[in-house]
Amino acid sequence: MGVLRIGHVSIKVMDMDAAVQHYEKVLGLKTTHKDADGNVYLKCWDEWDKYSLILTPSDQAGFNHVAFKVEKDSELDAFQQRVEAAGVKTQMLSEGTLPFTGRMLQFQLPSGHDFRLYAQKEFVGTDVGSTNPDPWPDDIRG
């Protein structure tokens, strides 16, 4: 049991239009969803999951959380016990707290950073496919 990889990062942005423009046109990310709260979800072209970056409107820039992906949903319960045994409070967030994402284990480190673990997120595949793929999409802009 262990963490597979960083699944997504959620950041606060003060100018959503400028941020989306930067991530799409300069870095080449792709918007995959916008929710009713004004959050914008983006993915890199070689990402398999629905999103890897969440932009949240805010009056100051900063990080909301970093989410790590684990292999199985059942591992979240074991991680909850392990994290709590280390003296860190946790909260299990229900499926759908974030769009297209299963339940998540949320905890805050003594440093004040908010982390989450999850196992399930909608799988959409890459922009180049997996059978003899091009090294990058034809329309990449970043």
What is the role of each PLM region?
Residues 1-17, 63-68, 123-142:
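N-terminal beta-strand motif that seeds the catalytic metal site of vicinal oxygen chelate
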Residues 1-4, 10-49:
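Core segments of cupin and vicinal oxygen chelate
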Residues 4, 61, 100-102:
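Loop/turn position at the start of each blade in beta-propeller repeats
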Residues 7, 21, 38-40, 53, ...:
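N-terminal, well-ordered alpha-helical segments
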Residues 13-17, 68-111:
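Vicinal oxygen chelate
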Residues 30-64, 114-121:
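Conserved short beta-strand elements that form part of the metal-binding/catalytic scaffold
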Residues 51-54, 84, 95, 106, ...:
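Intrinsic, low-complexity N-terminal interaction/targeting segments
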